[in-house]
């Protein structure tokens, strides 16, 4: 029986382990962490015949030196860097290393896939696309880097019609060449450079997905994609929220907004007022989803039904409540400066902004300029708080406080809204969550809980 070692006991690693076990592999799992939650998962998997090691860093040389069996294959979760020394050594030793998306693709390649990637906008576009396909009667779950992993979907007994998958750069770097029916690219700004090293490497990872797709759909409003990708895939479809004239020059295949209508190849398709979510960025997500559905043969009236019933996704400009006549908004999904800028631009000022976490590389200047324009106060949390305080001081913004934790920040915001004419309290961190939380969802859930307790 072939053996496989799965590294990472997150949702994707657990699902990959179970799927491989079902397919006849002898599976073992490891994770470098040890927490009560992981110990519970360890007990569940071991009851299913899958041994789990916690507080363990996989190392090939250690296995060899103590005479333990070397696995025939290694499968990694998205959080495990592709270029880590242990994985480099494994590949040099001839051991195949794959990501969990590769396991899912191997299982579900007979189905049509819609794959969505990009720096920002992936989650909303994925969820909206799935909502439209489901309105058409398809079993088409949203999965991947959103909610259920793709391997979790592969484990379900119910027959699938489509796979609607959000795929991150972390997942793509460990994936084989995929051949989806549709590949969508939402936006491109520098992100995850601490993982990929350079912008070129980050772009190449994203482009990897487009190369095998039957239909490529690109965001023509995104400056980087317009400048660098126009001739990359000659048969690609482009979208724009700013009319046909705003499509890249020489593009024959376009879907755009003009006169409050979505136009497809100069033919009106459906009105824009059916979209409930605010902001131009959400119009871009809307066009990408509509273009996909239309090209897949879904009628316009069904697309409109799916869009009209879609209110947005948790943690992305999610309205929690109105308290003291102030809107409290959860934007925990804003894990970089560009997403945080979009979030701040989308709400009504004056704003109390709660920001911070684990800082990323990137250009924070547009975000800081908007803070000067719209924020009455900034409350800083997490590892990045001292760094952000210095950046705010550098632009002459002094209405900030270092709060360290989200509990303290929400309590301070609740006090400030009684003293100033605030319209919105916005939690839009501009940072990763891993300094204080397992993921952005846990962070956003905590913010929601704190708001509802006011």
From Swiss-Prot:
GO terms for biological process: cell division; cell wall organization; peptidoglycan biosynthetic process; regulation of cell shape. Its EC number is 6.3.2.9. One of its GO terms (molecular function) is UDP-N-acetylmuramoylalanine-D-glutamate ligase activity. It catalyses: UDP-N-acetyl-alpha-D-muramoyl-L-alanine + D-glutamate + ATP = UDP-N-acetyl-alpha-D-muramoyl-L-alanyl-D-glutamate + ADP + phosphate + H(+). Keywords: ATP-binding, Cell cycle, Cell division, Cell shape, Cell wall biogenesis/degradation, Cytoplasm, Ligase, Nucleotide-binding, Peptidoglycan synthesis. Pfam families: Mur_ligase_M, MurD-like_N. One of its GO terms (cellular component) is cytoplasm. HAMAP family: MurD. Belongs to the MurCDEF family. This is UDP-N-acetylmuramoylalanine--D-glutamate ligase.
């Amino acid at each position: 029986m072939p053996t496989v070692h799965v590294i990472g006991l997150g949702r994707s690693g657990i699902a990959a382990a179970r799927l491989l076990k079902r397919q006849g592999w002898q599976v073992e799992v490891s994770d470098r962490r040890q927490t009560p939650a992981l110990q519970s998962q360890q007990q569940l998997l071991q009851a299913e015949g899958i041994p789990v090691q916690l507080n363990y860093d996989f190392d090939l040389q250690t296995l060899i030196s103590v005479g333990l069996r070397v696995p025939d294959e290694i499968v990694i979760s998205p959080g495990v860097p592709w270029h880590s020394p242990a994985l480099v050594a494994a590949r040099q030793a001839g051991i195949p290393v794959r990501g969990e998306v590769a396991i899912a693709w191997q299982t579900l390649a007979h189905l049509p896939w819609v794959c969505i990637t990009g720096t920002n906008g992936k989650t909303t576009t994925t969820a909206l696309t799935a909502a439209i396909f489901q309105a058409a009667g398809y079993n088409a779950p949203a999965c991947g880097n959103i909610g259920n992993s793709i391997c979790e979907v592969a484990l379900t007994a119910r027959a699938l019609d489509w796979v609607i998958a959000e795929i991150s750069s972390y997942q793509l770097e460990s994936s084989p060449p995929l051949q989806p029916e549709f590949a969508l690219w939402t936006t491109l700004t520098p992100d995850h450079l601490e993982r990929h090293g350079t912008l070129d490497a980050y772009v190449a990872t994203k482009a990897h997905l487009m190369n095998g797709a039957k239909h490529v759909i690109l965001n023509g409003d995104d400056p980087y994609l317009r400048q660098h990708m126009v001739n990359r895939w000659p048969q690609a479809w482009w979208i724009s929220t700013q009319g046909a004239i705003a499509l890249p020059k020489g593009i024959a295949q376009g879907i755009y907004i003009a006169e409050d209508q979505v136009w497809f190849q100069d033919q009106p398709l459906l009105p824009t007022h059916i979209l409930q979510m605010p902001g131009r960025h959400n119009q871009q997500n809307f066009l990408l989803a509509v273009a996909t559905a239309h090209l897949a043969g879904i009628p316009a009236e069904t697309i409109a039904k799916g869009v009209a019933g879609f209110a947005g996704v948790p943690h992305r400009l999610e309205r929690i409540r109105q308290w003291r006549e102030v809107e409290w908004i959860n934007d925990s999904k804003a894990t970089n400066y560009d997403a945080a800028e979009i979030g701040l631009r989308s709400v009504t000022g004056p704003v109390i902004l709660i920001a911070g976490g684990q800082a990323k590389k990137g250009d924070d200047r547009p975000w800081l300029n908007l803070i000067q324009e719209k924020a009455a106060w900034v409350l800083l949390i997490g590892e990045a708080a001292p760094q952000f305080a210095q950046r705010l001081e550098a632009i002459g913004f002094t209405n900030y406080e270092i709060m360290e934790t989200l509990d303290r920040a929400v309590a301070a915001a609740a006090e400030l809204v009684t003293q100033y004419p605030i319209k919105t309290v916005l939690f839009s961190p501009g940072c990763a969550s891993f300094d204080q939380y397992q993921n952005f969802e846990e962070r956003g859930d905590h913010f929601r809980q704190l708001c509802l307790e006011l």
